[in-house]
UniProtKB/Swiss-Prot annotation:
PPIases accelerate the folding of proteins. It catalyzes the cis-trans isomerization of proline imidic peptide bonds in oligopeptides. Acts as a regulatory subunit for PP2A-like phosphatases modulating their activity or substrate specificity, probably by inducing a conformational change in the catalytic subunit, a direct target of the PPIase. Can reactivate inactive phosphatase PP2A-phosphatase methylesterase complexes (PP2Ai) in presence of ATP and Mg(2+) by dissociating the inactive form from the complex. The gene is RRD2. Keywords: Cytoplasm, Isomerase, Rotamase. This is Serine/threonine-protein phosphatase 2A activator 2. It is an enzyme of class 5 (isomerase). It comes from Kluyveromyces lactis (strain ATCC 8585 / CBS 2359 / DSM 70799 / NBRC 1267 / NRRL Y-1140 / WM37) (Yeast).
Length: 360
């Protein structure tokens, strides 16, 4: 069974120098390089049966979302909608059945391996207790794809670009639906000093897509007409369009200064290179995120890491994950703050013209 193991800085040092760390970032690099110069719909043909099966699995997730409408506090709360927990429970209950269908016609992994795959899949959709989502959950989806690759579902030589362009983009679309429908709170958002309240990898993959483009430049994100024209063709511009849609009170320079700074880089290839370095530093090397990372059969825990604690494995605890002092922080950690309503919630409440307080 996949379990959490990273609880202190010593563990993080072992993790940062481990083969598993290199396997994860190497997998992301392989996927990123495979989409250089490709638009979102530029799939590699023929599309393999296994890629199509995983795409069908994601379509089932969309169907499950449709079964759980927001009813309670639909118009009166800026925080995450509790119906998200019903969706999450539905996914958890049916994950084994759904994922088993991927292996029709090929060797199915044993129960332990399948349980690991299900763990990454379930945790790809956010946190049930806190009703939030962040880059750590996004990483779980990458681990899910990695496990399928290690299980011979994917052949990276032929499937890598389609894993990004068909599967990751479809996953991103589903997550946007969840964020909008259930007003998921941003898990560990860096506020204006982050790329996005929820996601990192669309910017990384998107920068690689654009790294060979002869005309579009990083500064093009400030041109509304260019963003509108290319939002469906490149991940990076799609992310900018989404941010502009939900953060309407100021310009990109004000609400997303990190993206504004990056837009000053001359070439997309340099942006892509910087995104990989930033992903290592801001996701894979950050304890508040990686304390929730699962190790198991496919992604081995480095030797010498702390033994697992029972509390760290609890998927559904209602209180803060930090009340036992099981890990330390050098900064205000992603997991220790109060609930922060999403920009999506603020935007939709404003559109409904709901005013809960006279100073709201």
């Amino acid at each position: 069974m996949a379990i959490k193991r990273l609880i202190n800085e010593h563990d993080m040092e072992l993790w940062n120098n481990s083969k598993t760390f290199e396997d994860v970032i190497g997998f992301i690099n392989t996927l990123a390089l495979s989409v250089r110069g490709r638009e979102n719909n530029d799939y590699t043909q023929p599309i393999s049966d296994n890629v199509q099966r995983v795409s069908n699995l994601l379509s089932k997730v969309t169907e499950i979302i449709g079964k759980h409408e927001v009813i309670k506090d639909a118009n009166t709360s800026r925080f995450g909608k509790i119906e998200f927990r019903d969706f999450y429970d539905d996914i958890s209950e049916h994950s084994n059945e759904l994922i088993s269908k991927i292996f029709e016609g090929i060797e199915k992994p044993d129960t332990g391996k399948l349980d690991d795959i299900c763990t990454y899949f379930i945790n790809s959709w956010g946190d049930r207790s806190r009703i939030d989502y962040g880059s750590g959950h996004e990483l779980n989806f990458i681990c899910f794809l990695y496990c399928l690759t290690e299980s011979k579902v994917f052949d990276l030589e032929n499937d890598s670009s389609n894993i990004v362009l068909m599967l990751f983009i479809k996953y991103l679309g589903i997550m946007r639906s969840l964020e909008l429908k259930y007003w998921l709170e941003p898990a560990g958002s860096h506020g204006v000093w982050g790329l996005d309240d929820y996601h990192f990898l669309p910017f990384l993959f998107g920068a690689f897509q654009l790294s060979t483009h002869k005309h579009l430049k990083p500064k093009s994100i400030h041109n509304p007409e260019v963003v509108e024209m290319f939002q469906d063709r490149y991940l990076y511009f799609g992310c900018i369009a989404f941010i502009n849609k939900v953060k309407t009170t100021a310009s990109l320079r004000w609400h997303s200064p990190m993206l504004d700074d990056i837009s000053g880089v001359k070439r997309w290839s340099k942006v892509a290179e910087g995104m990989v370095k930033m992903y290592k530093a801001e996701v894979l090397q950050k304890l508040p995120i990686m304390q929730h990372f699962y190790f198991g059969y496919f992604l081995k825990c480095p030797e010498g890491v702390s033994e697992p604690s029972a509390r760290a494995q609890d998927h559904h605890e209602d209180d803060s994950c930090c009340t036992d002092g099981s890990h330390g922080h050098s900064t205000w950690a992603d997991c220790c703050g109060i609930a922060v309503p999403s920009a999506i919630a603020a935007s939709q409440m404003a559109n409904k013209d709901v005013r809960l307080f006279p100073f709201d």
